[in-house]
Amino acid sequence: MKLTCMMIVAVLFLTAWTFVTADDSRNGLKNLFPKARHEMKNPDASKLNKRDGCSNAGGFCGIHPGLCCSEICLVWCT
């Protein structure tokens, strides 16, 4: 009986501790949606479309097509 009561108290304490230390996420999605809507209107604003560090035509790529902006690599970007 004592062990059961101690387990119940421990679970309640840990549950309360989780709620007290959690981040306030009430406005999390509210701030996310306007940014997503802006990226849908302007696809160039999306971070996924940006290719930082890619080589233009004539740049050395070895055999890794991911290094070229055109994704075509034959030792040199084409």
Swiss-Prot record:
User: What PROSITE patterns does the database record attribute to this sequence?
Assistant: DELTA_CONOTOXIN
Listed as disulfide-bonded, the cysteine pairs are C54-C69, C61-C73, C68-C77
UniProt cross-references to InterPro entries, sorted A to Z:
Conotoxin, Conotoxin_d-typ_CS
Write out the annotated subcellular location.
Answer: Secreted
Q: Indicate the secretion signal residues.
A: 1-22
Query: Which residues, by range, are in coiled-coil regions?
Result: none
A Pfam family that this protein carries is: Conotoxin
Q: Which GO terms describe its molecular function?
A: sodium channel inhibitor activity; toxin activity
**Tissue note:** Expressed by the venom duct.
Q: Which UniProt keywords apply?
A: Disulfide bond, Ion channel impairing toxin, Knottin, Neurotoxin, Presynaptic neurotoxin, Secreted, Signal, Toxin, Voltage-gated sodium channel impairing toxin
* Annotated Gene Ontology cellular component terms: extracellular region; host cell presynaptic membrane
Task: Name the propeptide positions.
Answer: 23-53
The organism sits in which domain of life?
Eukaryota
Homology family = Belongs to the conotoxin O1 superfamily.
What is this protein's function? Delta-conotoxins bind to site 6 of voltage-gated sodium channels (Nav) and inhibit the inactivation process.
Supply the domain comment: The presence of a 'disulfide through disulfide knot' structurally defines this protein as a knottin. The cysteine framework is VI/VII (C-C-CC-C-C).
Query: Under what name is this protein listed?
Result: Delta-conotoxin-like S6.8
